[in-house]
C-alpha cells in the first residue's frame, strides 16, 4: 500500500532528478495535473524526507500534527472542499466531497484554488500557469472527481 512507503517525496525527487525529469517538468507548457504526492512535489520543499522539490509553487509541504485525540494521520477518507476557483473546479456543485489519503499537506497560499479542513484549513488544490494539482484523489472521488478530470482535459 502507498501509505507504507516511507519518505515518498524524497524517493520520488531522487528518481526525478536522476533522470532529469525535474527540469523537464519545469519546462512543460501544456497543462500538467499533479495528484496527491504529485501536488507536494510541485512545491518548494517537503518535510517528508526533508527534500527540496520542483518549486513551481512557492510553498513548503508540512507534516500533519494531530491537535486532538480524534485526529488521525494519515488523513484518510472523504472530506468537503470549498472556496473553489479556477476552471479545474467548475461545475462541481457547492462544497463537494473528495477522497483523501495523506500525512503531509500544503498550507494555504496564493495559488490555492480549493480548501479543505482537517486538523486545520489547507490547500486541497493549487493552480499556477499551466500547473494544476489536487491533494485528493479525483480518480477515487466518484462523479466529482470525474468532473475534475473532464475539466482538466478541456483546459
Give residue spans per PLM region.
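Cysteine-nucleophile active-site neighborhood
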Residues: 8-75
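Short linear Ser/Thr-Pro motifs
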Residues: 1, 44-46, 103, 141
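Short, small-residue-biased leader/transition segments that mark boundaries at the very start
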Residues: 3-5
Amino acid at each position: 500500500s502507498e501509505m507504507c512507503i516511507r519518505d515518498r517525496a524524497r524517493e520520488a525527487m531522487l528518481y526525478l532528478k536522476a533522470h532529469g525529469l525535474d527540469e523537464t517538468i519545469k519546462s512543460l507548457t501544456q497543462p500538467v495535473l499533479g495528484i496527491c504526492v504529485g501536488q507536494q512535489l510541485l512545491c518548494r520543499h517537503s518535510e517528508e524526507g526533508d527534500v527540496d522539490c520542483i518549486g513551481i509553487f512557492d510553498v513548503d509541504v508540512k507534516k500533519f500534527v494531530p491537535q486532538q485525540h480524534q485526529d488521525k494521520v494519515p488523513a484518510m477518507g472523504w472530506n468537503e472542499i470549498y472556496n473553489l476557483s479556477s476552471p479545474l473546479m467548475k461545475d462541481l456543485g457547492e462544497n463537494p466531497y473528495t477522497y483523501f489519503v495523506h500525512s503531509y499537506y500544503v498550507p494555504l497560499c496564493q495559488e490555492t484554488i480549493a480548501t479543505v479542513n482537517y486538523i486545520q484549513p489547507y490547500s486541497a488544490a493549487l493552480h499556477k500557469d499551466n500547473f494544476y494539482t489536487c491533494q485528493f484523489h479525483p480518480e477515487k472521488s466518484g462523479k466529482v472527481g470525474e468532473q475534475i478530470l473532464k475539466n482538466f482535459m478541456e483546459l
